[in-house]
Amino acid sequence: MFKKLIKKNKNQPIQSEFGLDLHNIPEHVAIIMDGNGRWAKQRKLPRIKGHYQGMQTVKKITKVASDIGIKYLTLYAFSTENWTRPENEVNYIMNLPVNFLKTFLPELIENNVKVETIGFMEYLPSSTLKAIAKAKEDTKDNTGLKLIFAINYGGRAEILNSVKTIYDELTAKGLTSDDITEQMIDDHLMTHAYPDPDLLIRTSGEQRISNFLIWQVSYSEFIFNEKLWPDFDKEELINCIKIYQSRQRRFGGL
């Protein structure tokens, strides 16, 4: 007599531990990591210390997201508007990936996490680009969580870039604006290889999306968490997932 083979879910222990619905884990979670500067100010520390601590939170949340079974985690690391911040702060943020990815890479490889990026990367310093390129190369064959850093990213600029590319293609083919479809725009966005976020989380209590994935979050669930990003932990993420699971997504219907 043959025993029935049951396919085990490697994420089931942590899902069960926190009372999550195993069949309703968001596939794609996007996070606006806000509050690093305020975290540092509360402790009378330089703002850059907040950014450093924020990267430690990235490590923790990436591990939890992977353990839960989230497939895509997109983190808003640096916006196209952030260049207006003080020069020393921008320089520090640009250098963060160099040391951060170097120390984080072994853990990413061990946990089968694949590093990817969206954004206008050509404007980043060469040292930053090299660190990112190495992380992407060393994790390219990983099949687990896709960790997507949005660096020098802006939603309006992304859509504008998409429209310009589509215009050039239409002109070359002798087509008109009547031939433009929603799917065509979607296919020309930086995120074309990923599903739209199911859940968008913003930390620090601010309630705006700050030019982040403005096309892609049309039907995402929004959660505005009061914790500053360096204080955001496993329990907070689990609670956000529970809130997400308590909602009924309608996608414009009833």
Swiss-Prot record:
InterPro entries: UPP_synth-like (IPR001441), UPP_synth-like_CS (IPR018520), UPP_synth-like_sf (IPR036424). Keywords: Magnesium, Metal-binding, Transferase. GO terms for cellular component: cytosol. GO terms for biological process: polyprenol biosynthetic process. Belongs to the UPP synthase family. This is Isoprenyl transferase. It is an enzyme of class 2 (transferase). Its cofactor is Mg(2+). Binds 2 magnesium ions per subunit. One of its GO terms (molecular function) is manganese ion binding. Mg(2+) binds at D34, E221. The keyword Hydrolase does not apply. Homodimer. The active site is at D34, N82 (proton acceptor). The keyword RNA-binding does not apply. PANTHER family: DEHYDRODOLICHYL DIPHOSPHATE SYNTHASE 2, DEHYDRODOLICHYL DIPHOSPHATE SYNTHASE FAMILY MEMBER. It comes from the Bacteria. Gene3D superfamilies: Decaprenyl diphosphate synthase-like. It holds the Pfam family Prenyltransf. The lineage of its organism: Bacteria, Bacillati, Bacillota, Bacilli, Bacillales. The gene is uppS. Substrate binds at residues 35-39, 47, 51, 79-81, 83, 85, 202, 208-210. Catalyzes the condensation of isopentenyl diphosphate (IPP) with allylic pyrophosphates generating different type of terpenoids. Its EC number is 2.5.1.-.
